[in-house]
Design a protein with these regions (language model features):
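RNase H-like, metal-dependent nuclease domains and their acidic two-metal-ion catalytic environment used
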Residues: 1-78, 84, 88, 101, ...
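Short, surface-exposed amphipathic charged segments that create phosphate/polyanion-binding patches used
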Residues: 87-96
Length: 169
């Protein structure tokens, strides 16, 4: 092999992921806050999202728009502390195969871009392996969902189907 082949960094296949509908490429220096909120409104229709949990990044711009659309907002003020608090839940979920990304290479890419740092006290934080090309936004969104995962109602569909079976039409 040539030296350049072994050291060449692989770029994420962004266009391929866009064609699969896993992401949308925005032509501009930043994403318009209305576009972000509009995406969440669409997801609310599919998944019943009512609450947005996020760190402080851009929330000064996004908060009024989210509130206007009827979302509840919770801001994680110390993301590093949140990393440490959620680390056991995240580690357990991955270790016990409770996380299934399905056929979504984008989420695997986000997760594989994360570097777990453990300080001298044993506290863990989730950092980027490399600052420029290694995006972790999807992993952080996943992590922040776990911040309030205990608020999600676990519904027993078997009971509902049993009840429907008892109804005579």
């Amino acid at each position: 092999r040539k030296a350049s082949e072994t050291t060449k960094e692989k770029f994420a296949p962004i266009r391929e992921w866009e064609e699969k509908g896993l992401l949308t490429v925005i032509d501009g220096p930043t994403i318009d806050p209305k576009t972000v909120v509009g995406w969440f409104v669409e997801q609310r229709e599919k998944y019943g999202i009512t609450k947005i949990v996020a760190d402080n990044f851009r929330m000064d711009l996004l908060r009024p728009l989210f509130l206007e659309e009827g979302f509840e907002i919770e801001v994680i003020r110390n993301p590093t502390a949140a990393d440490n608090l959620l680390a056991p839940r995240i580690e357990d979920a991955f270790a016990n195969n409770h996380i299934i990304f399905g056929d979504n290479p984008l989420m695997r890419w986000y997760t594989n871009n994360v570097l777990v740092k453990t300080n001298g006290d044993g506290n863990k934080s989730y950092k980027k392996k490399e600052e420029v090309r290694r995006k972790t936004d999807g992993f952080k969104a996943f992590e922040y969902c776990l911040w309030r995962a205990d608020e999600i109602i676990d519904y027993d569909y078997d009971d509902a189907f049993d009840m429907l079976d008892e109804i005579e039409f």
